[in-house]
């Protein structure tokens, strides 16, 4: 049975943080680090652009539910970030990218290890008034966005597991 919709009532737009990452910065990991440093636990990624190398993005293949087949596109050379959006909930980064290289455009779910090539400029908006987190959905095997009353976890830190790449690894076992 598919997960139910989630609506977080009472959310308010907070302050906006504009970030420029530099050559060699890890995109996903830097976003998480900046949110921790700035104490902004819940964020909407408004926009972002720049260039990356050591790229890894994942996505779903096929129409079946729950998803069982995934692609993982990796590029060691430079690609341009055309668009970037997502939600950071309890410091857990869930970001999708539209990218291009000389062969054309493609996209997917941002995975760890993607390095900034020349720059990445990103606008983040804090979400106030609600507590957001990601919880494991047993049907999809993914961590889905939820409105929660508490941030308590077993080790006190958010679990970054739950990307499509992680789900695909789990299914291969």
Language-model regions, residue ranges each:
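N-terminal intrinsically disordered, cationic/polar leader segments
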Residues: 1-94, 98-173
């Amino acid at each position: 049975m598919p997960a139910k919709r989630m609506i977080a009532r009472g959310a308010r737009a907070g302050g906006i943080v504009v970030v420029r990452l530099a050559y060699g910065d890890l995109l996903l990991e830097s976003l998480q680090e900046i949110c921790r440093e700035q104490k902004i636990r819940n964020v909407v990624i408004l926009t972002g652009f720049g260039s990356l190398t050591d790229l890894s993005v994942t996505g779903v293949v096929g129409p079946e539910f729950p998803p069982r087949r995934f692609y993982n596109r990796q590029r060691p050379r430079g690609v341009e970030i055309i668009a970037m959006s997502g939600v950071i909930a309890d410091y857990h980064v869930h970001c999708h990218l539209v990218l291009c290289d000389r062969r054309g455009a493609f996209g997917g779910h941002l995975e760890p290890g993607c390095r900034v090539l020349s720059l990445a400029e990103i606008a983040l908006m804090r979400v106030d008034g609600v507590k957001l987190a990601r919880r494991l959905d047993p049907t999809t095997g993914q961590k889905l966005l939820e409105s929660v009353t508490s941030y308590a976890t077993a080790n006190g830190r958010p679990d970054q597991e739950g990307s499509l790449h992680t789900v695909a690894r789990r299914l291969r076992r």
